[in-house]
Amino acid sequence: GIESKLKKVDWKHRDVLIGSVRSREQMAACQDHRFYYVPVSMLSVDNMPIHEVALYQSRSLFGQEAGIEYYGEVLSIEKVKRSEITEIPRYSDSLYYRLNIKGWVSLGRKIEVKEFGVQTIAFTNHFLLKHCTQVPELFIKSEEAFRFLMELKRKTSDASLINDDNITGFEFGEYKVVFEDGEIKLFGENGMMDHCRINDFVRRPNAQFRGLMRHMIL
């Protein structure tokens, strides 16, 4: 079940590349020829190895088809000139990574676009790819944050991840929850309303969540 999978997640390890698709032509070519490509300048040694690629379709280009539905296992990565990617011709000597994909697999659902999406590329892990329902959730950084979100989503459909790389937390209605300094802090319109230790939440998530929720009107 999900509990056994959750215990195995390495939250610092992000080996799923989320690649933004720039056109319907690119989507068709990448799917038909089982590959994805990205400028060498966008990846560093720290991003390697990449084990899977997930295709992100923006709302502006794909409308009702927006979100993430397809992902695939990376078989190999080649460094090539852009002009050598003949499936989508463009004359350029710029260097790209060509990621060859075993086959594109459907998640069986869409990971929905919410407040913010993916401009070029981003990274997540396989667990989040398989269990998240909205794109911002793919950037959750810890088990306790994932567990808190699952509890929160049972109470409200309004919850969203705070769009800030330096903050782990969620916004919903007039409230905000922030994970910092070893604590989970609840803020309302007039400042901090309550807090609990992250360690206490890990030991007793339901009880600690209920303790914070008593302050909220959802």
Mark where each language-model region is:
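Acidic metal-coordinating catalytic centers involved in nucleic-acid phosphodiester chemistry
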Residues: 1-5
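Structured alpha/beta reader/binder surfaces that contact nucleic acids or chromatin modification marks
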Residues: 9-167, 171-173, 180-182, 189-218
